[in-house]
Amino acid sequence: IVLSVKSSNPVIFQKGNKITGTVVDAAGIPIIGANVMVKGTTNGAVTDINGKFSLNVEKGDLLEVSYIGYLSYEQKIGNEQALAITLKEDTKTLDEVVVVGYGTQKRGNLTGSIATVKSEEMTVAPVSSTINSLGGRLPGLVSQQTSGQPGADQATIKVRGFADNAIWIVDGIETDFNRVDPNQIESITVLTDILDKAKYGPMASDGALLIRTKKGGYNTPMQIHVDMEGGIGIADRIPEWVNGIEYARMNNAARAVSGYSQLYLPEALEGFSQKDPYDMKYPNVDYKSLMLKETLPLSRVGVNFNGGGDRVKYNFSFNGLYSGDIVKNSASNDYSKLNASASLTAKVGKYIEVSADFNTLLSFRRKGRTSWYNYRSVPAVAFPLTLGQSLGDDGARLNTPIYGVSRTFTQNYYALGLEGGFNTERNRTGMLNTSIDLDLSWLIKGLKSRTLLGLTQFVRTTIGKEEDYLGYYWTSQDGIGAISTHTGTKKSGKSILSSYTMQSLSFYERLSYDWAANGHKIAAGATFVMNDNTNKSNDNYQRQLYVTADISYAYTDKYIVEFVAQYAGSSRFNKDNRFAFFPSAGLAWVISKENFMRDIRWIDNLKLHTQVGLIGETDIFGAPYLYQSDYSAATNGMWLGANSKQDSWFGTNRYVTQYVTMNRL
């Protein structure tokens, strides 16, 4: 049993004497972003744009330097104060077998470039969203996170700057990446080149990310791993809000520039300077301090069983995660999820292997009816936080406060967070993938078949209650005046606010053939894929079909040619324009393997490659079935008749065209 506690940040603590250094490659070019760590600790740094780093270490520490595509470097620290480190390229990666295009291929025999990240690089910190663990770990992949709300903090992913519509293929099935726990992932491969994307059809026009999950191993004793992780999230670079006295002075200055008289007289400025959020006439509310904490908690626990015998291998995983929030005035802002997965693979005879993978995820996102950023729209002097306690019919004071609002700013977001109710967004996901692999070498040497069937169902239900608070405004003449839109409504029970169900069915069949002799290598294949997606909430149904043929030829691993031809169709278009043909081709020349390069030792691998082709795109104008009319009813028609009755009418919502088809990129 391996029990480990991981920190939330791999670089959190430094000690001892300071050393500096530079990391370069064999040509002397600085390596940007190399990891420099004291082995076995969390003490580390990352090289800057000039390949330089600084780090506090102690004598006897073992320094480890690593970067993707290069061999790791280790050095024991003595009395050095400056280090010059040269990393050598990992040429073994050229012989690495990588997943690409529903199959595998040697990295060195590709006419394009791919990037891969391993599972251990994704689990250095607990994150509520799996996508967030990819930031900065894959070249060509841009991760942008725009929210830190628990359960809504997923980053958007762009491959080589394209739109955030890259698809995720998990064990051959397209799905939402966030439905897979990072600890279940074996590796992730990013496909960015034309040929690699073409093999996955029109849905991969913006790129594809291939995820392989852990499967266990044959003839491997059972291993049990227990991981516990904890961390703290810190709100970074939140803008400062102006306080009441600052707001009043800037308002007066702006009015003076425009030729208006001052709105806030010295008496008001003196009142705002007291910084009293409950002052009836001169409130000064510090919403940031009232609303936000400086940190939020993160924790994760996971248990994994894996192993296998001669005929069967298995992997079972159970994970739980909790993320708090930085919001103070709502007890219902947090996110938790539970994930369980099981993978079984068995050899049936000499030529057959079957597998079944099941994954289920249950998540709960609790939130109030407001967010912290809503406070930015309300000046600190708009109204007092509360105006005291409300009174019952008998004149007795009730527990419900009277919250302040104004005629201009009619929403007290502090009150809305406390008294406005809450909702819980519950997401349930179930995924089942089954596959059969046939070795047909008894029929034709090098011939293989793979059949895959996948079913995914996603259900989102939002349960909660929407309530109201008692809102009043202060006037100098009338005292307290009621705002009729805030009635103090309370509800005894919760109800279903919304529901959404999505179901996907995928079928995949591939025949592949490999042949090699006398320096010649051929890899060929034919693939049929069908994807059905049904939104059961509104009966929206879509289907995609495509057939792909691909062939790759390599001579002495120096000269490489690839061809891909695909015939793809989508139900989004009229039957006469649903299908289209997309050819692609690629060439590569591994110059470093030529005889005239043997004496140039500072170059380990040099490849010249190019690709050209067409890729389809189905997501046109954001809506399917543009060849069909879409009607709606309205009641704001013409006033007709003696009684001036306004009639109802029906009208189309869009122009109909029979000629829209796939984009060709």
Where is each model-derived feature located?
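Acidic, glycine-rich flexible loop segments
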Residues: 262-285, 300, 375-413
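Active-site-proximal polar cores
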Residues: 471-473
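Low-complexity intrinsically disordered tracts that form flexible linkers/tails across taxa
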Residues: 365-377
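Short, small/polar-rich motifs associated with maturation and membrane association
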Residues: 1-340, 353-355
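Localized chelating/binding microdomains
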Residues: 126, 130, 156-158, 198, ...
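Extracellular/periplasmic, surface-exposed regions of secreted and cell-surface proteins
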Residues: 122, 164-165, 343-352, 357-362, ...
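Short, solvent-exposed aromatic-acidic interface loops
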Residues: 229-233, 366, 610
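Short aromatic-enriched loop/helix-cap "lid" or pocket-rim segments at secondary-structure transitions
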Residues: 8-10, 237-240, 368-370, 464, ...
